[in-house]
């Protein structure tokens, strides 16, 4: 919208969806979009359906490598309950930082169903002031766009993720002997595995679990805080 001299609307949110092979085909356009940036009242979210065993895709696929190569943050819901809240957070992050945001959904999550209570869902309190000029502008040279992405948008995105506590410490103890960092769906599987061997309250055994919902960019302050508890 900000590329027009006299736009007729304030902003547009866009949601792209595709499986892994579709992401491969679309990477040229996606890379250009992320280098250009979103408008201040817009937002771009890429919902990528990963099929790691090739159940219903032409190839087994993991999307992280492609998204990271384009400088796109990755949100990874652990289950059906997290898809909508994290999707809304992804849109807010995109609008705030001017960056595209990936939403990774694995086949196990996409093929499952659940009753989800959204009555308490509220927009996150950003609580941040915009410090940098991160949104798309007219006639920005290619090298300037790349510099903006890596020196302004990604640091802004990292601060948003940290301040809004998107990554979570699920179970912890002050006497931790073992810290488990689980990414996305592996968080649920880790808890199920501990339950299966009778460890229903990991903290009693000195075990802490950190749910990494944004595997890239990794928020080092979140990891340090978890390890220091």
Language model features with spans:
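Thiamine diphosphate
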Residues: 1-95
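Flexible, low-complexity linker and terminal segments
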Residues: 77-229
């Amino acid at each position: 919208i900000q590329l027009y001299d006299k736009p007729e609307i304030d902003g547009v949110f866009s949601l792209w969806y595709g499986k892994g092979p579709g992401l491969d085909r679309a990477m040229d356009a996606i890379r250009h979009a992320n280098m250009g940036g979103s408008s201040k009242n817009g937002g771009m979210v890429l919902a990528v359906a990963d099929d790691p065993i090739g159940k219903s895709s032409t190839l087994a696929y993991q999307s992280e490598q492609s998204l990271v190569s384009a400088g796109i943050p990755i949100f990874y819901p652990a289950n059906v309950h997290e898809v909508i809240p994290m999707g809304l957070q992804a849109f807010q992050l995109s609008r705030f930082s001017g960056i595209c945001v990936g939403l990774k959904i694995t086949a196990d999550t996409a093929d499952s169903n659940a009753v989800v209570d959204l009555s308490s869902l509220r927009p996150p309190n950003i609580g941040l002031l915009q410090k940098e000029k991160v949104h798309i502008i007219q006639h920005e040279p290619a090298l300037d766009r790349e510099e903006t992405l890596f020196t302004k948008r990604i640091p802004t995105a990292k601060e948003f993720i940290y301040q809004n506590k998107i990554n979570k410490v699920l179970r912890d103890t002050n006497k931790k002997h073992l810290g488990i960092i689980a990414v996305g769906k592996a968080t649920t599987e880790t808890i199920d595995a501990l339950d299966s061997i009778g460890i229903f309250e990991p903290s009693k055994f000195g075990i802490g679990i950190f749910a990494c919902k944004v595997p890239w960019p990794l928020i080092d302050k979140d990891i340090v805080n978890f390890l220091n508890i």
